[in-house]
Amino acid sequence: VALIVATALAAPSLSRPVVGALGAVITRPFGAIGRLARTNSVRNPRRTAATAFALMLGLMLVTVIGVLGSTAKASVDSLVDTGVEADYILSGPQSIGVPTGATTAAQQVAGVDRTAVLHPVFVTIAGQEEYGAAIDGSPEGLLELSMVQGTADLDSDGFSVSETEAAARGWTVGTEVTFDTVDGASVPVTVTGVFTDNPLIGNWIVSGDIYQEVTPSITRSDILVLVKATPGTDLDTLRTDLEAATKPFVVVQVQDVEEFKGSQGQQIDTLLAVLYGLLALAVVIAVLGIVNTLALSVVERRREIGMLRAIGMQRPQVRRIIYLESLLIALFGAIVGVVLGIAFGWGFVQTLRDEGLGTMTVPWGQVVSMLLGSAVVGVLAALWPAVRAARTKPLEAIADL
């Protein structure tokens, strides 16, 4: 908030050099008409900044969301590529996961070597509510776990923890930990391994036996089912058989790793589309602001426009001046908004790094599209004020009637 307020206060000072630099490039092909447009755009820096601020704020938010969405998709792709070794992944809606019957059916398909079922686990550790994962079956060959200490094999009371979590709590292999459940029971577990931080899994992972103990039957669910094919099995045939086995469970999807990444990215895109739709209102408000400011500017400069018309300026030239002024104002707001959006996006990515976001990814294609779109918006916003300016009657304007 402080940075936004600071930008609003600094915008008048920024508008003169930024708009001047833009004008030197954009208006050059238009000769004297272009010079007039550039001069008019920097004549009142406060008005220029105020006009561009709504567009600046809207595009800043769009850029922040775009950076977060692009980074999230890239992070998901990286996590799946480095953490999942399964041939196929069975998934379902987030609200219900994969039905248990579908898991059993998939395990019985010919050509399936082994499976690993991931479950969410919610327990209380030392008075704090914690979230982790449970796995039925060995993660070997299905999930990439880089062990720092101990083993990835989870026995009946096995409990593997991430390196960061182990260091924070002082846990090592052999440490006994107590899980307090929602039913009021206490379940003792023993740390059997410490693995390199893996956001795909979380802070810790327990065996399926412990999952059964700490999770009431009514809340149990399968998040994902990882399937590894028997060596030599035709993967296309296996996929067909898996789809046939899980067909009675309509919500189940059978995907390979690439398809799974695509589906996760599509969910992110859907969320972004909703947010972009809401932010479109800010752009509409910005356009109205530009129209209003240009209209007021035309009224204030009525005598000036009349004088220009009297000495020979044609109506198309008058309209062109207004178009260029609006274009410069819109681009000023867009450029500052995009720069701020990238800066804010970087800050959010750094803050959320522990939640699994990796290296920041900027959607440059989207950024270029926004700048070009802002230029178009600027010209469209100037249509009515430009027509009004061009209709100015020279003699009446000079006489200020």
Task: Enumerate the language-model features and the residues they cover.
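Juxtamembrane segments of multi-pass membrane proteins
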Residues: 7-165, 173-175, 183
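Hydrophobic positions within alpha-helical transmembrane segments of bacterial inner-membrane proteins
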Residues: 8, 12-13, 55, 59, ...
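Short helix-loop junctions at transmembrane helix boundaries
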Residues: 1, 321, 335-373, 383-396
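Peri-transmembrane interface segments
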Residues: 248-284
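Alpha-helical membrane-protein architecture signal
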Residues: 30, 34-38, 49, 257-267, ...
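Interfacial "coupling" helices/loops that link adjacent transmembrane helices in transporter permeases
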Residues: 286-334
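Cytoplasmic membrane-interface segments at the C-terminal ends of transmembrane helices
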Residues: 8-42, 294-310, 380-399
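Small-residue transmembrane helix packing/gating motifs
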Residues: 83-84, 197-240, 249, 255-258
